[in-house]
Swiss-Prot record:
Subunit structure: Component of the MRN complex composed of two heterodimers RAD50 and MRE11 associated with a single NBS1.
UniProt protein name: Double-strand break repair protein mus-23
Organism taxonomic ancestry: Eukaryota, Fungi, Dikarya, Ascomycota, Pezizomycotina
Subcellular location: Nucleus; Chromosome, Telomere; Chromosome
Location of the region described as Disordered in the Swiss-Prot/TrEMBL record: 516-739
Comp. bias regions, Basic residues: 523-532, 637-646
Residues that coordinate or bind Mn(2+) 2: D56, N123, H212, H240
Species of the source: Neurospora crassa (strain ATCC 24698 / 74-OR23-1A / CBS 708.71 / DSM 1257 / FGSC 987)
Protein encoded by which gene: mus-23
Biased composition (Low complexity): 599-636, 694-722
Gene3D superfamilies: 3.60.21.10, Mre11, capping domain
SUPFAM superfamilies xref list: Metallo-dependent phosphatases
Length: 739
């Protein structure tokens, strides 16, 4: 197909931006967000159709307000505008996007999006905590990012594409967000990863996959091999690896190309980070693509070098006593050479800038010198303290605390992991012996003392979230959820059938363990979402769309595909299952189970306190005022009327029970405050109207609310039972009370 602008999809590709990295460093605090802003400027200047981010947009799971502000500022400044987006969205948005707004942002009539941004999450900004939200959920709710590639169940992954078309070019965009590498490797091995393909003209689609996993085998199972991915892919954008290998490389076994854009900011001073940083402009026309590399100019220059004193001619003859001063002097010369090299590289990158000032000074570079000071037999190299040596370059480098790294191979010490004859599995264990994992610590703890009520596997996961993701409420929410679930299960048992309560608790704990191991234990999901606003809706005349009852709809429960119900064309050996059947891309015809309305427990009973309460609001007795102080206003008690319907149903709110107030306690408080009561109203309260019957199912309640016309409730009249007035008493009344 000949290339033309009308048929070419232009995509800016970037991964691992790590906004917020070293934001408390006095020199490097603004490096990450400045480079991300440059990337968004490039997207606008190059007039691309979309931006694809491959994970780790933020460096932390809970980014700071500064980081979130800078990202939202860049996205709003460079990606919003009046330019129409030429990409035609062909997918069912409800299948690829989740959340309150299940549609692509550039089709939202309330937002003018010129350059849509599509992103998956990485291992640094992954979802966690109550509700299973991440920072990308906030950006999606703000209409700035299209968050796709979610993995609700790590042991049963379904990857559905975003179908886009421009002219005659069709693209299927697949997203696979980060999952712990060992678990992802096991899921691929067990053929539990299923990729869906378009059911029409599947040979006309350009298949693009973005994923965020280890690319290389750090250990036996802590990576995803390229041959595990489906061979119908045309290009794979590989995130998580920070070395910039922007040129696509073809895999001869699978036939697709792999591009590794790398990070846009150096987060570790290793040789892979010293490779010049780039972003790519991907031009797709039909089934062919081209890549244009664009260097990033706001990246801080970085130079690394490694020397061995025993083999370096500049340090010949210094392997003797009292040689520290001379070694330090010659090492300082090498570091100064590296600083000049870094500054020269920065000037070369900015040589073609028309707006660059000749007197402009380059930023302080990053310099890392690794020194092996292992001496021959009978000799010795004396080196200076690395921190003291690094501080000599304060004001010359950005990393003035860790410029040099000294290491020495101790005599007689051998690397057992790399010794010949050592089995591969034993070497793997020896290499990871110094790595302490939270999961291992929890398992060792439970091996000595077992749990009776709480399940062990979810407990270990909650502790891992607390330590790794800084989720301060992970353990608390786990305990509350586990105990409440077990209490509900025990209350459903018949009293005459309960023989051994401990046995029931043990059985249910094992059920929760198996559910978690099978990947069925998930966070509470949202059950309602907003419909798309009709084209003819006028907010000024008809009111805000989100305030209308018909704007809400139930989120259909996803039906798990069964292995025997959907035969596939073939079962690939790569550990991936994909399907070409028509029903695989059409999930709307599946039956949706109807959940019964939760019981309200004690709230369904009529109590004495409920009889006193008015239909609308209830006045609470005023607090007892301290002497010589002005009486405090009465505290407003919670309303006893019908609870206002919210857009989302929280599982905690569904199970919350309303308990009647204890009238005896109110009477006792009134007796204690008798000395402060001047006048009392003995008028009896009018009886409350009978309670309205409740809906028997959630579906019925939803349909009823959709048909009903919203009417503002009139404020209910409440009679105050006891009036505590602070006006001076009448002389006659006071005399009768004293008499």
């Amino acid at each position: 197909m000949p290339r033309s602008e009308a048929d070419t999809i232009r995509i800016l590709v970037s991964t691992d931006n790590h906004v917020g990295y070293a934001e408390r460093h006095p020199v490097r605090k603004d490096d990450s967000w400045r480079t991300f802003d440059e990337i968004m400027q490039i997207a606008k200047k190059q007039d691309v159709d979309m931006v694809l981010l491959g994970g780790d947009l933020f460096h932390e799971n809970k980014p700071s307000r500064k980081s979130m502000y800078q990202v939202m500022r860049s996205l709003r400044k460079h990606c919003l505008g009046m330019k129409p987006c030429e990409l035609e969205f062909l997918s069912d948005a409800a299948e690829v996007f989740e959340g309150a707004f299940p549609f692509v942002n550039y089709e939202d009539p309330d937002i003018n999006v010129a350059i849509p941004v599509f992103s998956i999450h990485g291992n640094h900004d992954d979802p966690s905590g109550d509700g299973h939200y991440c920072s990308l959920d906030l950006l999606q709710a703000a209409g700035l990012v299209n968050y796709f590639g979610r993995v609700p169940e790590a042991d049963n992954i379904h990857v559905k594409p975003i179908l886009l078309q421009k002219g005659r070019t069709k693209m299927a965009l697949y997203g696979l967000s980060n999952v712990r590498d060992e678990r992802m490797h096991r899921t691929f091995r067990d053929n539990k990863v299923r990729f869906y393909r378009p059911n029409q003209q599947k040979n006309d689609w350009f298949n693009l996959l973005a994923l965020h996993q280890n690319h290389y085998a750090h250990t036996r199972t802590s990576y995803v091999a390229e041959n595990m991915l489906p061979d119908f892919m045309d290009l794979v954008i590989w995130g998580h690896e920070h070395e910039c290998l922007i040129d696509p490389v073809r895999n001869p076994e699978t036939g697709f190309h792999v591009m590794q854009p790398g990070s846009s900011v150096a987060t570790s001073l290793v040789p892979g980070e010293a490779v010049p940083k780039h972003v790519a402009i991907l031009n797709i026309t039909g089934r062919k693509f081209e890549v244009d590399k664009i260097p990033l100019k706001t990246v801080r220059p970085f130079v690394t070098r490694e020397i061995v004193l025993a083999s370096d001619k500049r340090f010949k003859g210094l392997d003797k006593q009292n040689n520290r001063h001379e070694i330090t002097k010659r090492l300082m010369v090498i570091v100064n050479e590296m600083i000049e090299e870094a500054n020269a590289e920065w000037r070369a990158v900015h040589a073609e800038d028309d707006d660059m000032d000749e007197d402009m000074e380059p930023p302080l570079p990053l310099v890392r010198l690794k020194v092996d000071y292992t001496a021959p037999d009978g000799a010795r190299y004396e080196v200076e303290n690395p921190h003291r040596f690094s501080n000599r370059f304060t004001g010359k480098v950005a990393n003035h605390n860790d410029v040099v790294r000294f290491h020495c191979n101790t005599k007689g010490k051998k690397n057992v992991a790399t010794a010949p004859g050592v089995r591969e599995d034993i070497a793997e264990i020896l290499e990871s012996a110094d790595t302490i994992k939270v999961d291992n610590l929890v398992q060792e703890f439970f091996a000595q003392q077992s749990l009776k009520i709480l399940p062990q596997a979810p407990f270990s996961d909650a502790v891992n979230q607390f330590v790794s993701k800084d989720d301060k409420h992970a353990v608390e929410m786990f305990v509350i959820e586990s105990l409440s679930t077990q209490v509900k299960e025990l209350l459903q048992l018949d009293d005459d059938k309960i023989v051994d309560l401990d046995a029931h608790i043990q059985d249910f704990r094992q059920v929760m363990e198996k559910s978690f191991d099978a990947g069925q234990h998930k966070q509470a999901q949202r059950t309602k979402r907003f419909k798309r606003k009709p084209d003819g809706w006028d907010s000024d005349l008809d009111g805000h769309w989100i305030n209308q009852p018909q704007a809400l709809e139930d989120i259909p429960a996803e039906v798990e595909p069964k292995g025997n119900d959907r035969p596939t064309k073939r079962v690939p050996t790569s550990g991936v299952t994909f399907s070409d059947e028509d029903e695989d891309m059409d999930m709307d015809n599946q039956p949706v189970p109807i959940r019964a309305a939760p019981k309200r427990g004690a709230a369904a009973k009529t109590t004495a306190a409920a009889k006193k309460a008015a239909p609308g609001k209830k006045a609470a007795p005023a607090k007892k005022a301290a002497p010589a102080k002005k009486a405090a206003p009465a505290k407003k008690a919670p309303a006893r009327g019908r609870k206002k319907k919210t857009p989302f149903v929280d599982s905690d709110e569904e199970e919350e029970e309303d308990y009647p107030e204890d009238d005896d306690e109110e009477e006792e408080e009134a007796d204690e405050e008798e000395e402060d009561v001047i006048m009392e109203d003995d008028e009896e309260d009018p009886p409350a109207p009978p309670p309205k019957p409740k809906a028997t199912s959630r579906v019925a309640s939803t349909r009823a609310s959709a048909r009903a016309t919203p009417v503002r409730a009139t404020p209910a009249r409440a009679t105050q039972a006891r009036l505590r007035l602070r006006r001076p008493p009448k002389p006659g009344l006071l005399a009768r009370r004293l008499g």
